[in-house]
Amino acid sequence: VAAYYRKVLNIENFSLNTIREPGEANGKRSNIINCVDDNVKVDLGKETPESDQATMIALKYALDHLDRDEIDVLTLAPQGPNAFFTEEAGSLVEYLGKRYNTADIMSILVSEKIKMGFVTEQVKLRDVPHQVTQKNIFKKLTLLDDTLRQDFTILKPKIAVLGLNPQVNCGQNGDEEVNVIIPAIERAREEGIMAIGPFSAERFFSERMYEKFDAVLAMYYDQGVVAFKSVDEESAACYIAGLPVICSMSLTDPHYDIVGQNLGDEQGLRNALYLAMDVCVHREQNIELQKNPLPY
């Protein structure tokens, strides 16, 4: 596949070091492990069942090496909407949750200006109210707080919580705010988590209130992602929290319409790669700091 693209794009003076295992990698060259049959069909600028199958093979292969500590981090390049979807597990986040036997997993959008987690992932809007429960909000607040401390070295994270209903903007809380969101926030504060809210999403972002917080917890994906990208899309990437391994991904769409024209922007993938590297360093620092603690 790589050779095909190199030929189509007419890339000269560039060679790939084909290896079989991560330990064979040459630090001075671009290394590649071929996970699929060399005869796999390539349709330039198209997502096909064959490409989706090859994507899942590569993902499983990389995770196997990650689990064996043969690589340190995993960064996913832009993919089509069905690339990481399986009938057995569902979406990528659901697949990773089942692979590592954990339900406490969450996509966190990360940029230089804002970090955002979600109570629900990319589910149908009609299913959102059923998933916005005290238990789920508390679990996500706990996970977000732990992640900010361990993976981003923020000692006392301050987390803003968005409301579910628009009338929060008028100082009026709906049933979900009164009976679900506020009790979850109060429980989190009892556990030492600095959670504040609920805030109206419109007012929160229009008045730039996010600048006063280390992270934001949105109730559902569409509530937060558009505002997040309007604040800072240039430095953005996605981090998948709650896993024993480090996994990040680009927020950039694959843009199949410009494939082969040398018009793509690599910044989104670069952001995801640097994010994974930063988290890796932070985890190592935390491990080192927790060694040989002084007695009380």
Label the model's feature ranges:
Residues 1-296:
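Anion-binding alpha/beta catalytic cores of soluble intermediary-metabolism enzymes, centered on
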